[in-house]
Amino acid sequence: MKPFAFLDSKRRFTALCICMVVIVAGVLLRLIWLQVVQADKLKQLTKSQLTAEYIRGTPRGRIVDRDGEEMAVSIMTGSLYADPEMMQDEQDEKNKKNVQRDVRRLSADLLAPVLKTDAQKLYGIFTGGGRFVWLKRTMEPKEAAQVQKIIKDNDLKGLHFLEESKRYYTKKRAAAQILGFIGTDDKGLSGLEYQLDDVLKGSETTYSKLHDAVGKQLLGLMVNDPGHELQPKQEKLPTVYLTLDSKIQYVLEDAMDDAMARTKAKGAAAIIMDPYTGEILGMASRPTFDPNNFGKYSPDSWTNRAVSMIYEPGSVFKPIVGCMGLTEGIITPDTPIQDNGRIKIADRVIYNWDGEGMGTVPFSTVIKFSINTGMVQLGMKLGADRLISYAKKFGFGTPTGIELPGEEGGILYNPKDMYEPDVATMAIGQGVAVTPLQELRAICAIANGGELLQPYIIKKIVAADGTVIKEGKKTVVRNVITEQVARQMREMMEKVVSEGGGKTAAIKGYRIAGKTGTAEKLAAGGGYAAGQYIASFVGFVPADKPRYAMLVMLDTPQGAFYGSQVSAPIFRDTLQQILVAKGIQPAASEGLPSFEEMNAVGQKDEKKQKQLPVLQRMPDGKIKLPDFKGLDMRNTVDLLEPYKLKLKPYGSGHAWQQKPPPGSEVLENTTVEVWFN
């Protein structure tokens, strides 16, 4: 044994111990560093690698009619997404083959037929990288179940579902512009969905899901994995009750469809309102759309013309001007008015609609037969200041404030800028622009005894816990006329239907009050568009104790275009169905004509009818044209329409020239141009 060998051994042992202490100390320090100093950071790193956080929303609130019948509802449904980073090629374990399985290609080929898309497009998504790509959102339950089965049967990685809310509009096109629609992120984009988005939008909660290194989901706290069915959850939701009556809305929608088919109008609007409360019972606009598939329709069809279209009202404005004259004491129903068929104001000549005069008649006859000359005389006596002041009192010139987006306020002159012709034309409903809702609201003030009401369409809003957070109620904005003036105008408007130009609105057994209107349409660049008209009718029933007030407006109907021809019959047919459906019994009413006795176009019975020329059907099917000279526009339309001939009119008054000329033989659907003066 070498000297000092023991000491060498002892030194080596000491050195080894020191090394062990250093190593253990290093490990302990590293553990302390990782477990204490870096603990939070490592936890977050682990969480980010093995979990993903997503937001789950509750279903959107319901929209129902006044009786609780659902119009817009939501259910929770599956939305499919991919995590391309987790879709790695792998060994084909299912078939026990020692080959690599192309997960991306297989997934694309299997899913494409169900998702109704191109497999190559899906493959491009799967190979594009990233951690989250939507494949299809808010799938139908049956479709989602098919995809779940494919994922489970083929053990596909990186494909998962999230629950999202899907909106259904149960009435399809009914009240489409009122309800509006939502986008893919559950955000209201139009109508009440937009206006009440804060109320209807569901709440959101963040959830996590756990997956393994290859993307297979281990635990779905919010996400439904392929082994579980996607089931809609029953949740307490906010509910918006509308003033709409679904039965009335259905009748109105059908009437509008029929009107558009018959008249080929460019657009239309109709509103039914409770004249004593301001509740909107029905509202329809054309063209329309199905909010379940709003993207398939033109944005023009999303517009609610009942509140957003402004137009010159024409003769339906005359009862408003008449109330001004009655209130100011300028006229009474019996005040004699001289009607010569035409009246000159400054450098402008204004004619009656048919160019004829009736001599001296009471003011009630001016309203009954819509005599322009009589209304112009009243307008000139009222003057610009009073015309505009009263128009504002009746609610024109400012939005009504209904709970719908996109409402227009109309257009009124500044009285300081009005010349005499402006005053004269405003008295007959020109030079003033209104919306259908504004016009109906003003007429309701006549129907209810003088109260200008705040129209409303939300009956109440009930929170998820049952608390009523808003409740609609009758609101009187102001009293615009006295009960006496309202009664006098109601009586005059009743004679419009029973004896005057609005006979086509009469419903046998019921007292109807109303007014027709036919106005030239404003051209985009100023002035009036040749041959384009707005045809309207506004009225209420029963005339003495109104239950329903209704306005019908047709934009540019083809062929017949007078309000008495196209709009009044819609009023009649719609309200007749509603009165029967609601059990409102007819009352004895002397003087109401039967349908057989009605003059089809509301001609003036007091006027001597001219002998009209005759069109001849030739053996070869062509139609021989007569000479239209001396006829008014209405008679010309009545002659052409049965032979399917179209009128393109120029000017107003009586015919003096035509093309093709008299004696020409033309085919059906030919357009006949006639110049009136």
Predicted regions, residues:
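Soluble non-cytosolic domains of exported or imported proteins
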Residues: T58, N98-R105, R137-K142, D186-S190, ...
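Small/polar-residue-rich segments within soluble enzyme cores
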Residues: R101, L106-P113, G124-K236, V552
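Short, small/polar residue-rich loop motifs at catalytic or cofactor-binding pockets
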Residues: I55-P59, K264-G267, P455, P649, ...
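Hydrophobic alpha-helical transmembrane signal-anchor segments
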Residues: D8-K41
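Juxtamembrane extramembrane loops of integral membrane proteins
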Residues: Y54, T58-K116
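Ligand-recognition elements built from short beta-strands and adjacent flexible loops
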Residues: G509, A523, V552-T556, Y562-A568, ...
